Amino acid sequence: MKTALLLEKLEGQLATLRQRCAPVSQFATLSARFDRHLFQTRATTLQACLDEAGDNLAALRHAVEQQQLPQVAWLAEHLAAQLEAIAREASAWSLREWDSAPPKIARWQRKRIQHQDFERRLREMVAERRARLARVTDLVEQQTLHREVEAYEARLARCRHALEKIENRLARLTR
């Protein structure tokens, strides 16, 4: 009974932290947030740390059910340390301005958004031309639409290639 109450309390703390961290949980930082012994994840978002803490809570529940006392003790201590670290990080988030993305990264993120918009518009144009091609019966117009579809597909391929390069560049910059 006592164990069940403690598990519920840990679950409540995790839920509270998830709500408290929700506004900033997806923001990545340039440097690691925590020591490697505390969190195994390489991601620099609070969401990844919250997910890992949730996984550890599930592992703790399983260990309690299996009555694996040494594992229960270690997992409980580790989970408590993780929750405490996340709470400290959530409290200190406003002080992390020095770790925000530099202008160079922001510029690449804008380029990514712009290229994603280009990709979406090109897909729409290809779909629209294909729909018109399916309805047209005139041979000359079919050939014209077919050339347009090929041209838009080539543009789409170049756009996707550029988007992939931008994603790779952002990945390198945020390592």
Curated annotation (Swiss-Prot):
Q: Does the keyword Ligase apply?
A: no
Outcome (variant: residue 33 to E)? Reduced loading of DnaB in vitro, does not complement in a priB-priC deletion
Result of knocking out the encoding gene: Called priC303, no visible growth phenotype. Resumption of DNA synthesis after arrest of DNA replication (upon UV treatment) is slower than wild-type, no change in survival after UV treatment. Double priB-priC deletion is synthetically lethal, causes a drastic reduction in cell growth and/or viability. Double priA-priC deletion is synthetically lethal.
Name one molecular function that GO assigns to this entry.
DNA binding
**GO cellular component terms given for this protein:** DnaB-DnaC-DnaT-PriA-PriC complex; DnaB-DnaC-Rep-PriC complex; primosome complex
Question: What's the impact of mutating residue 96 to A?
Answer: Loads DnaB in vitro, does not complement in a priB-priC deletion
Q: Please name the Pfam families in this protein's record.
A: PriC
Q: Tell me yes or no: is Transport among this UniProt entry's keywords.
A: no
Q: What happens on changing residue 89 to A? A: Reduced loading of DnaB in vitro, does not complement in a priB-priC deletion
Instruction: Tell me the impact of changing residue 121 to A.
Output: No longer interacts with SSB, does not load DnaB onto SSB-coated DNA substrate in vitro, does not complement in a priB-priC deletion
Keywords associated with the record: DNA replication, DNA-binding, Primosome
Gene Ontology biological-process annotations: DNA replication initiation; DNA replication, synthesis of primer; DNA-templated DNA replication; replication fork processing
Instruction: Report the function annotation for this chain.
Output: Involved in the restart of stalled replication forks, which reloads the replicative helicase (DnaB) on sites other than the origin of replication. Recognizes abandoned replication forks and remodels DNA single-stranded binding protein (SSB) on ssDNA to uncover a loading site for DnaB. There are several restart pathways, the PriA-PriC pathway is a minor restart pathway. Also part of the minor PriC-Rep pathway for restart of stalled replication forks, which has a different substrate specificity than PriA. priB and priC have redundant roles in the cell.
Give the family, as the similarity comment puts it. Answer: Belongs to the PriC family.
Task: State the domain notes.
Answer: The N-terminus weakly binds single-stranded (ss)DNA. The C-terminus (residues 96-175) binds ssDNA as well as full-length protein.
Assembly description: Monomer. Oligomerizes in the absence of DNA. Component of the replication restart primosome, which is composed of PriA, PriB, PriC, DnaB and DnaT; DnaG primase associates transiently with this complex. Interacts with the C-terminus of SSB; this interaction is required for DnaB loading onto substrate replication forks. Interacts with DnaB alone and in the DnaB-DnaC complex, probably 1:1 binding with DnaB.
Protein's name according to its UniProt entry: Replication restart protein PriC
What is the protein's species of origin? Escherichia coli (strain K12)
Instruction: Name the gene for this chain.
Output: priC
